[in-house]
Amino acid sequence: MLLLPSRGKLYVVGIGPGKEELMTLKAKRAIEEADYIVGYQTYVDRISHLIEGKKVVTTPMRKELDRVKIALELAKEHVVALISGGDPSIYGILPLVIEYAVEKKVDVEIEAIPGVTAASAASSLLGSAISGDFAVVSLSDLLVPWSVVEKRLLYALSGDFVVAIYNPSSRRRKENFRKAMEIVRRFRGDAWVGVVRNAGREGQQVEIRRVSEVDEVDMNTILIVGNSETKVVDGKMFTPRGYSNKYNIGEKRRAERMGASTKGGMEVARRSEEILRSFYPEEGLRGDIIRRCIATTGDVTIKDVIRFVGDTEEGVRALRDGCRIIADVHMVRAGLRRDAIVAVDFARGDDTRTASGIRNLAEMIEGSLVAIGNSPSAAFALCEVAEKHPPRFIVATPVGFVNAAESKEMVRKLPVPSVTTEGPRGGSGICAAIVNCLIEHADRPD
């Protein structure tokens, strides 16, 4: 059978959020050129003033395959514009068009026309919530199992991405939204969230809330979850890209002292340092670390169990070089003044979650600063991993009476500089205090 080439063409057109002013010129030209307009009724209604006199075919929600079949069939003889909200390739209809055309060997010219996404529209309305690396996650489990959605959200949050959340809730999926907010709260605390409803359309609503304040949302809402850098000032939500540091924009950052930066806080820190020096007067980085541990525990005798191996300044150099921090548990990460990857988030198998996570992060361990404040099993796993993938620096202070002392003794035998506690004493707070002291030294001007 002879297959004649198609005389038509299919445009898959992203019309943006809704308003004509946010539609690209190319999208308008494709709609103008088209003989047929095919689409979901809601999207077609948004461009009704642009399609007068054209043949229009609409289908209801969840009839995407029917729309694609109709559009491809018509495009064999006619110019067709298949309408998609936002951008057709981002949670739009374009992937289905391509997949169906390839699988069924449909001989039709297809051209995709990008559109302004809900994420970019919402970010602009909020201020500049998305400015650099970010992730986009849909909470809809109609096409993707919830277990996969949850895993993707976990990785996006653990990577400290700004996260744009599409399809946060519907009448049938309120539970997914609740679960997602619990995950966000676990990773980000009470972070800033931009809540934008009907971006670029009638009924537009723009709010900036804390995670704890986000309650009822619907399918017309997009959420933008800020990362560790995101700020809210004068009603604008923005995530700096680093220009302030590069070009000295704004006030010069005040040097921090024991985590304090305000005038009152600095005075308290100064007085605390005077008292701490009376307990332990040694100068330098090691003296600062021991004093920080005394301040954290309120126990002067903690100085007797802190152990240093190798060049402690290597931890400062590593942080100045921008090395990643890997912590065993969220409690350590919560106390740090820089972001960290948490081993338990990468756990698989029958081993303890921290040990499993450390092993699964083996290649990332190499060259990292590893902070273990809770789990002896994580310290044992680190010693195994370090043979092939040595970290650059280790802080290990797991606490307890089962294997804690033994695991730290193994860490001290590694050819890697480290700070540890001897015996059963330690804990996540001490671990975070030591790492923060290294961070403070790393942040000081040369």
Curated annotation (Swiss-Prot):
UniProt-recorded name of the protein: Cobalamin biosynthesis protein CbiHC
Catalytic activity: Co(II)-factor III + S-adenosyl-L-methionine + H(+) = Co(II)-factor IV + S-adenosyl-L-homocysteine; Co-precorrin-8X = cob(II)yrinate
CDD domains in the cross-refs: Precorrin_3B_C17_MT
Region feature (Cobalt-factor III C(17)-methyltransferase): 1-246
InterPro entries recorded: 4pyrrol_Mease, 4pyrrol_Methylase_sf, 4pyrrole_Mease_sub1, 4pyrrole_Mease_sub2, Cbl_synth_bifunc_CbiH/CbiC, Cbl_synth_CobH/CbiC, Cbl_synth_CobJ/CibH_dom, CobH/CbiC_sf
EC number(s) from the headed UniProt entry: 2.1.1.-, 5.4.99.60
Annotated pathway: Cofactor biosynthesis; adenosylcobalamin biosynthesis; cob(II)yrinate a,c-diamide from sirohydrochlorin (anaerobic route): step 3/10; Cofactor biosynthesis; adenosylcobalamin biosynthesis; cob(II)yrinate a,c-diamide from sirohydrochlorin (anaerobic route): step 9/10
UniProt family annotation: In the N-terminal section; belongs to the precorrin methyltransferase family. In the C-terminal section; belongs to the CobH family.
Keyword terms of this UniProt record: Cobalamin biosynthesis, Isomerase, Methyltransferase, Multifunctional enzyme, S-adenosyl-L-methionine, Transferase
Region span, Cobalt-precorrin-8 methylmutase: 247-446
Annotated SUPFAM superfamilies: Precorrin-8X methylmutase CbiC/CobH (SSF63965), Tetrapyrrole methylase (SSF53790)
GO biological process: cobalamin biosynthetic process; methylation
A GO term for molecular function: methyltransferase activity
UniProt source species: Archaeoglobus fulgidus (strain ATCC 49558 / DSM 4304 / JCM 9628 / NBRC 100126 / VC-16)
